[in-house]
Amino acid sequence: MIPKKIHYVWVGGNEKNNTIKQCMKTWGKHLEGYEVIEWNENNFDIDSHPFVKAAYKAKKWAYVSDYIRAYVIYKYGGIYMDTDVMVYKSFNPLLENHAFIGRENSMHQTGHTMEVYLAT
């Protein structure tokens, strides 16, 4: 069973804009009872891997996020989501699976790939 944990990464110290805040509000609305965990410089050791250390030093936030998301899903299980993901309904029916992947709806495509990973 997939744990009721939502992981996201926010590094670099920038403030979340209104779009991000609105997207994240939908998480609380539809994912009641889920633990939401923000991974950042305070709770992830940026120096733990040479790739992350170099990416962070170069301010390549997406690369830093790529590493952290894979690490936390492997170590803790749960759900990883980018901060610009809007949730429209509960994930509870999917939690009995070993894993699943979500993708961007064609009605809302921005040209970017939406990242949603789930694992046990």
Which sequence ranges carry the predicted segments?
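N-terminal anchoring/stem segment of glycosyltransferases
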Residues: 1-49
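Aromatic side chains
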Residues: 7-10, 34, 39, 56, ...
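Structured loops at beta-to-helix junctions and adjacent beta-edge loops in soluble globular domains
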Residues: 9-12, 103-104, 120
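Aromatic-acidic/polar surface patches that form glycan- and anion
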Residues: 13-20, 57-66, 112
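An acidic/histidine-cluster motif and surrounding catalytic segment
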Residues: 35, 46-63, 94
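Short hydrophobic/aromatic-rich motifs at helix boundaries and adjacent loops
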Residues: 41-43, 117-120
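GT-A fold catalytic core of metal-dependent nucleotide-sugar glycosyltransferases
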Residues: 62-112, 117
